[in-house]
Amino acid sequence: MAVSAYTVPTTSHLGFNQKKQLFFCNKSAYKRVSFSSRPCVITCLAGDSQTIVIGLAADSGCGKSTFMRRLTSVFGGAAEPPRGGNPDSNTLISDTTTVICLDDYHSLDRTGRKEKGVTALDPRANDFDLMYEQVKALKEGKAVEKPIYNHVTGLLDAPELIKPPKILVIEGLHPMFDSRVRDLLDFSIYLDISNEVKFAWKIQRDMAERGHSLESIKASIEARKPDFDAYIDPQKQYADAVIEVLPTQLIPGDNEGKVLRVRLIQKEGVQYFSPVYLFDEGSSITWIPCGRKLTCSYPGIKFFYGPDTYFGNEVTVLEMDGQFDRLDELIYVESHLSNLSTKFYGEVTQQMLKHQDFPGSNNGTGLFQTIVGLKIRDLFEQLIASKTAAPAAATKA
């Protein structure tokens, strides 16, 4: 196997354990080469296929992991950690999809952040140069050795080999923060959990499951809020789709976060993406489906659909307030939605029933995550078809 090398400048951002030398090879096989016991990066071309890159942004504890499980299920096969690798790896791999956690691009470990007085949300605690270089390489069909941030120890572990998949999902705090990384994305999603719901969820989890006090939970939320407002929240303006989770309007004064109002905000004019609509495209519609065909206990279910603007962009909004009593009855709602990009009648309902134990399966979070997953599958298929058609057209010309 022919291997060529060139020297990387000493200021290069190659991450932990990634030093002076960078290698390229013309086969998918790789081997680790070291000089004077110094580890290095091996990057291998992986054929002519180009990887599709999806970005998912959200704060910690806002449902990214559940969304990833729904998305990989749509493509078939469960996402699992790399076999034989670091047991604390954050990467998930399925037949078609690789999910990279952007925490792996922390440039400071837990102790380093504490010493410098910065949070993981602060750009100064993250290596955006390396993030850009490696996402770009994977998109171009090259394998990379990606660093690992160990959430158990808070340390930066030795890197792991990531081969270019058909679909690369980069999820975390900053997938749309750096304009260079943002420009590499073929589609982007932001999970926008309101402060009220986020607080209610954290209380339910940390008080009920972890024994934390209410005061400590409030202090934790307030400590990270300035950085969240400055660096994470603004990314939603760039997203192609936003799933916004709000307190219900069906129960006056509800603060428990158990019944939710969820909005799917879909940007118009995105290539290979046509927004989902209810009944009549472009109209403004309020629909209460409870009755003979849908079982609804208090407080019921209410849908809304209509056009809107979002950060100056034309968008289509689909909203669900309330929750399902019986998931099998979701087929009635599905039959009134269009542009779902399903392969067969009832696929949304089937996916929801398949993962009814996932958080949010009885409300709009699970429904809209599933719908976005189906839309991403359709976008992927259209992108692949367009790339296949382009060389054929050039040959005929």
Swiss-Prot record:
UniProtKB keywords: ATP-binding, Calvin cycle, Chloroplast, Disulfide bond, Kinase, Nucleotide-binding, Photosynthesis, Plastid, Transferase, Transit peptide
Top-level lineage group: Eukaryota
Activity control mechanisms: Light regulated via thioredoxin by reversible oxidation/reduction of sulfhydryl/disulfide groups.
Top EC class of this enzyme: transferase
GO MF term (any one): phosphoribulokinase activity
Reactions accelerated catalytically: D-ribulose 5-phosphate + ATP = D-ribulose 1,5-bisphosphate + ADP + H(+)
PROSITE patterns named in the record: PHOSPHORIBULOKINASE
Pfam families reported in the protein's UniProt record: PRK (PF00485)
An example Gene Ontology biological process: reductive pentose-phosphate cycle
Pathway listed: Carbohydrate biosynthesis; Calvin cycle
Transit peptide location on this chain: 1-44
Localization (cell): Plastid, Chloroplast
EC numbers for this chain: 2.7.1.19
Disulfide pairings: C62-C101
InterPro entries in the cross-refs: P-loop_NTPase, PRK, PRK/URK
CDD domains according to UniProt: PRK (cd02026)
A GO cellular component annotation in the UniProt record: chloroplast
Family label: Belongs to the phosphoribulokinase family.
Protein name per the record: Phosphoribulokinase, chloroplastic
Species of origin: Mesembryanthemum crystallinum (Common ice plant)
